[in-house]
């Protein structure tokens, strides 16, 4: 007889394998939750740099927040008739969409960072500016800039999708107690704002 915990673990592993080994897809928008599925997905896809993401002072993991925001944005977009390709951190596919967003929260020396964006040269200035204008008006803390690290500018996810608009979004620094306290009750709202931005910028 298979014990229930063992069966549950086996089903979870099978589900993860199905997600990470997904086929290439096409749609209107790709939404990736940063670090989702790690560390398990790193072993399946032989990822060497298995970055597990940031964590707050109370142990909250970045990958729980990215999933919450990504799932809410995906829910809203699909409810409005958009075709959404929803991806975790690691997956064996190359997708084609009109716009791709990659969701993250920063980790740093406490309160040394804030919100930021990363994007390749092919992303339009109008797309970046529209997000920055919207989010700066909402986020009451520091906006640290664009492509301010190589990991942002050359994010691996950009290579896994064909899209005219690609952008990594750092919503804020979860290692800063003030920013963490502000963002924690607003994860659903962050997903809603991201969906609203994408619906304004991406035609169905």
List each language-model region with its residue ranges:
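Bacterial N-terminal signal peptides that target proteins for export
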Residues: 1-9
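C-terminal segment of classical bacterial N-terminal signal peptides
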Residues: 14-21
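Active-site histidine-acidic residue metal-binding/catalytic motifs
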Residues: 25-92, 97-100, 106-107, 113
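Active-site-adjacent mobile loop/cap segments within catalytic or ligand-binding domains
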Residues: 29-30, 100-112, 116-118, 149-204
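Soluble non-cytosolic domains of exported or imported proteins
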Residues: 60-68, 121-126, 180-192
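Hydrophobic residues within alpha-helices
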Residues: 69-73, 131, 194
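Short gly/ser/thr-rich secondary-structure transition/capping motifs
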Residues: 82-85, 148-152
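Active-site-adjacent substrate-binding region
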Residues: 123-151
């Amino acid at each position: 007889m298979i014990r229930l915990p063992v069966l549950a673990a086996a089903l979870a592993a099978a589900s993860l394998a199905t997600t990470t080994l997904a086929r290439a897809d096409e749609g209107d928008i790709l939404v990736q939750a940063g670090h989702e599925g790690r560390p398990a997905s790193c072993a399946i896809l032989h990822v060497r740099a298995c970055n597990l993401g940031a964590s707050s002072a109370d142990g909250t993991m970045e990958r729980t927040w990215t999933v919450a925001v990504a799932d809410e944005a995906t829910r809203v977009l699909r409810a409005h008739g958009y075709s959404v390709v929803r991806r975790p951190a690691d997956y064996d596919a190359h997708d084609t969409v009109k716009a791709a967003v990659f969701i993250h929260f920063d980790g740093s020396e406490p309160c040394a960072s804030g919100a930021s964006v990363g994007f390749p040269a092919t992303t339009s200035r109008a797309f970046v500016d529209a997000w920055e204008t919207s989010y700066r008006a909402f986020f009451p803390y520091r906006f640290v800039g664009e492509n301010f690290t190589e990991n942002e500018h050359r994010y691996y996810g950009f290579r896994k999708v064909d899209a005219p608009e690609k952008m990594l979004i750092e919503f804020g620094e979860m290692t800063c107690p003030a920013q963490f306290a502000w963002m924690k009750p607003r994860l659903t709202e962050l997903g809603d704002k991201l969906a609203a931005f994408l619906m304004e910028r991406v035609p169905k």
